[in-house]
Regions:
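Extracellular/lumenal glycan-associated surfaces
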Residues: 172-174, 390-403
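A short glycine-rich beta-alpha junction/loop motif
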Residues: 6-13, 85, 99-106, 139-165, ...
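Sequence-specific dsDNA recognition surfaces
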Residues: 8-12, 25-77, 215-227, 231-267, ...
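A short beta-sheet element
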Residues: 73, 77, 81-128, 147, ...
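Non-catalytic DNA-recognition/assembly elements of restriction-modification systems
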Residues: 2-39, 153, 157, 161-165, ...
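Acidic, low-complexity, intrinsically disordered peripheral segments
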Residues: 241, 399-410
Length: 410
């Protein structure tokens, strides 16, 4: 029986009713799984949640390439490439390139005559990302992988080929417009953050590198979660937002199953991500919580305003002082050092001209006025970006499922 004649009944809860002329076929009838290794000289490819299959060096990627490139799999244009561990996040796509990908990916050669661009949009649409999550198995979110047997049965939604091409043309054009708008707004956010940084540098930068060492103004704390009776929230530290509850910035569960060894921080404590301190990853805890045992938890002496101190430590001059003191393998430049960390002892050797409490309060007030204005603009811009991204995802879903006739709106 020709696989081109194989169709399946529509009983798929995550897809809308079929449009006239549209069909469903199982993935196994359209693709053949192939594992073609031992091609170390081919270019490296990777699958990104936001970009699909692209050259690995075209995007920032924290995953290290294995020394033995012979274990990587060769794929060709039109092949379906799936990151089995991250399919539920959207790390799936039809490759437009020839190259090699991780040996842990699932690679399928095409055995069909459908439009590759349409299939790429389809496989990366919200309904299909939802389907990958349904077909993934594991201990918990963040540690799952797609079930191979279930994946082979994935129903593929197929309009006539001429409609596929029209959908691909429409989405190429419309998403490019949205992406341009999003990029403009992202550049605006970057510019606003630079203005924010410049305001802090202007107000406090000159106080760095003179007067007394920081050790006279800070106390390091090391209280562990298993030493306190409270059930405290997990906190995270970022370069952009400082210290926040982890559940406010990511839906992923904690990587560590046992958090009993995590450090306790109290509201107003200074928390430093020691691996990213030289990039400004520090801030004041907005509430009691627990943080990674690798973080440093510090408390300012009573005569030092914690908000003033955190602002001073995020100035460009102070961050540069920290960068000079990191210890790790490699260079601190652009975060290239492997396992870079700053020791609290080295941190406390940095000099800081701490004024009297009244002057601290005045400087904090001036900075806060500027920060509040800029932060409002950043929030408004980021909300606009989020709405544009939601619009983009909804447009893709509507097009690939036939909820809009792209030939009428083209």
């Amino acid at each position: 029986v020709s696989t081109a004649t194989i169709e399946i009944a529509h009983d798929v809860e995550w897809l809308p009713p079929l449009k006239p002329g549209w069909t469903l076929r199982p993935l196994w009838s359209m693709f053949e799984r192939i594992k073609d290794v031992d091609h170390p000289s081919e270019q490296m490819l990777s699958v990104f949640r936001d970009y699909g299959v692209v050259a690995k060096d075209s995007r920032r990627n924290l995953n290290q390439t294995a020394e033995n490139r012979s274990i990587y799999q060769l794929v060709h244009p039109g092949w379906l490439v799936t990151n089995r561990m991250k399919a539920w996040q959207g790390s799936v796509g039809i490759s437009p390139l020839r190259g090699i990908v991780s040996g842990h990916y699932i690679c399928f050669a095409p055995r069909h005559r459908e439009d590759h661009r349409y299939l790429n949009w389809l496989f990366r649409s919200a309904p299909y990302t939802h389907a990958y999550a349904l077909k993934s198995r594991g201990v918990r979110i963040g540690q799952v992988e797609i079930d191979n047997d279930e994946y082979k049965l994935l129903p593929i939604l197929l309009p006539p080929v001429d409609v596929q091409r029209a959908i691909a043309d429409y989405l190429d054009r419309e998403t490019a417009r949205i992406d341009t708008l999003i990029q403009e707004q992202q550049r605006l956010v970057e510019m606003l953050r630079e203005r924010r940084q410049a305001a802090a540098d202007t107000e406090l930068g000159a106080r760095v590198g003179t007067s007394q060492r920081l050790k006279w103004f800070l106390e390091e704390l090391d209280i562990r979660a298993n030493e306190v009776p409270e059930d405290l929230p997990l906190m995270s530290v970022s370069i952009d937002w400082g210290v926040r509850r982890r559940d406010e910035v990511t839906a992923d569960e904690a990587r560590a199953a046992d958090l009993s060894n995590y450090k306790v921080c109290r509201r107003g404590d200074l928390v430093i991500n020691r691996m990213r301190a030289f990039q400004g990853a520090l801030g004041l805890a907005p509430e009691d919580g627990i943080v990674s045992p690798d973080y440093a938890v510090l408390r300012a002496v009573p005569q030092v305003n914690g908000e003033w101190l955190a602002a001073a430590m995020k100035t460009g001059r102070f961050v540069s002082e920290m960068a000079c003191r990191i210890k790790g393998i490699g260079s601190a430049e652009l975060g290239a050092a492997r396992t870079p960390r700053i020791n609290v002892r080295d941190l406390c050797d940095i000099q800081l001209d701490v004024p009297d409490p009244g002057m601290q309060a005045d400087e904090v007030a001036r900075i806060r006025r500027v920060f509040d204005e800029i932060d409002t603009l950043i929030t408004e811009t980021e909300n606009f970006i989020e709405l544009a991204q939601e619009r983009r995802a909804a447009l893709i879903t509507a097009a690939v499922t036939g909820q809009i006739d792209v030939r009428e709106v083209a």
